[in-house]
């Protein structure tokens, strides 16, 4: 059985299940690297995968948690409604575009709700670390009001339909998969820096199907 939920729901559910001693997942796989590693610190079973030699050193943590993907964080935009010349190629360009056309972008920019999405919170923290002008950039981006969501799917739907025009800090893997069959959805990577995440996976110490969990992780 595979349960798909956002990173905050995953964290809270796993913590609750461990505290109650009830049935829980054999494997945890989270896009929120910080909360994923927090769970691994407290609950991961040590397992040296035979595939470990195929991974870069940074993707292995104490033979317990593994970074399983390499996913850039991107902007998305509506190709029908955003002229090619306006497509932002940096966070600064995005902020400048929105600040210069506040009427057009009023409530038309979407991103993660950092109160409900652990991934969204993590990306905001990393933006702050990477961008010395983070708070000014954020203030300009938010001038017309932000439409926030707890997961990537609704953001892509809203941008594709035109309900929103631009999405900030979306996972490139989801955006690329959607854009292959959605002519309205465009993708742009910021040139001054691009955040990259790796989904964290580990086997629970309380796994009831340990062999199957090892095979799945491998």
Where in the sequence are the language-model features?
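Active-site catalytic pocket residues across diverse enzymes, especially alpha/beta-hydrolases
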Residues: 18, 126, 178-181
């Amino acid at each position: 059985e595979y349960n798909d939920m956002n990173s905050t729901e995953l964290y809270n559910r796993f913590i609750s299940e461990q505290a109650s001693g009830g049935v829980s997942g054999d494997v945890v796989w989270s896009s929120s690297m910080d909360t994923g590693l927090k769970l691994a610190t407290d609950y991961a079973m040590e397992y040296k995968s035979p595939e470990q030699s195929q991974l870069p050193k940074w993707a292995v943590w104490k033979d317990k948690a593994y970074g399983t993907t390499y996913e850039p964080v991107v902007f998305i935009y509506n190709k029908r409604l955003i002229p090619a010349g306006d497509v932002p190629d940096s966070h600064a360009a995005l902020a400048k575009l929105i600040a210069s056309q506040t009427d057009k972008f009023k409530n038309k920019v979407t991103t993660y709700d950092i109160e409900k999405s652990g991934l969204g919170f993590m990306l905001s923290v990393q933006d702050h670390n990477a961008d010395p002008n983070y708070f000014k950039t954020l203030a300009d981006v938010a001038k017309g009001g932000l439409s926030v969501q707890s997961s990537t799917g609704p953001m892509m739907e809203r941008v594709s339909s035109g309900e929103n025009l631009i999405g900030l800090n979306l996972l490139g893997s989801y955006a690329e998969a959607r854009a292959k069959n959605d002519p309205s959805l465009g993708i742009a990577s910021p040139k001054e820096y691009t955040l990259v995440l790796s989904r964290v996976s580990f086997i629970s110490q309380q796994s009831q199907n340990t062999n199957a969990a090892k095979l799945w992780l491998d």
